[in-house]
Amino acid sequence: MARLEVDILTLFPRMCAGYLGESILGKAQEAGLLAATITDIRDHATGKHRVCDDAPYGGGAGMVMKPEPLVEAIEAARARLPGAWVVLTSPRGARLDQALARRFAEHGRLILACGRYEGVDERVMTAVDMQVSIGDFVLTGGELAALCVVDAAARLVPGVLGNAASADAESFAGAEGLLEYPQYTRPPEFRGMRVPEVLLSGDHRRIERWRRREALRATRERRPDLFTRVSLPESDLRLIDAGDDEL
């Protein structure tokens, strides 16, 4: 049975515990499809106060995470999870996308090291396999990014989602990476806004064509950078501008 094993190394364990215990991730752990451990980096610090940060050499604002506690936490995690990839959450990292999330899910073992303060001592990089970012912005720490990695990867593990087709139909899924089509549920009319007729028709072929058209339109309008990378057949180029009566 495939499953995802993760160990999150953090200075603030409670920030991660709540999220991992709820909703799909909580159920995945109960089902044995996700094994999530949270390690307090301070457990690997020395001294009475277990200090994990210090002033940067060369001067400058803020504090830098010391190498000893984090590297020792990584080494201990590697011993628990042989073969795991060590991933440091960092604005300098590769952008997390669906393809990378799938690689993480398929690999099955991750050690996620969360940065804090002004950054991490560069010597820690000798113990890291890769750095990952969730966008071109700066957060207070790497915990939110680590949780994004776990969430994105775990939902791709077979059995985690109730309907296996859910992951395949979502935005960025599949080789094309299109955005998802719009979703509707009851009631059929809300404040004068009606659900598209085609979704109520029961005609599965028309529904699939409508969903395909709307995914193409959404990607073209909202993420032209993605749209220009997709090689579309002539049928899709015709479909994207087709009216509902042409579906």
From Swiss-Prot:
Residues given in the record as S-adenosyl-L-methionine binding sites: G115, I134, G135, D136, F137, V138, L139
GO process annotations (BP): tRNA N1-guanine methylation
EC number(s) stated in the UniProt entry for this protein: 2.1.1.228
Any single GO CC term annotated in Swiss-Prot or TrEMBL for this entry: cytosol
UniProt cross-references to SUPFAM superfamilies, sorted A to Z: alpha/beta knot
The reaction(s) this protein catalyses: guanosine(37) in tRNA + S-adenosyl-L-methionine = N(1)-methylguanosine(37) in tRNA + S-adenosyl-L-homocysteine + H(+)
Free-text function comment from the UniProt entry: Specifically methylates guanosine-37 in various tRNAs.
Assembly: Homodimer.
Family: Belongs to the RNA methyltransferase TrmD family.
Database matches in NCBIfam families: PRK00026.1 (NF000648), trmD (TIGR00088)
Name by which UniProt lists this protein: tRNA (guanine-N(1)-)-methyltransferase
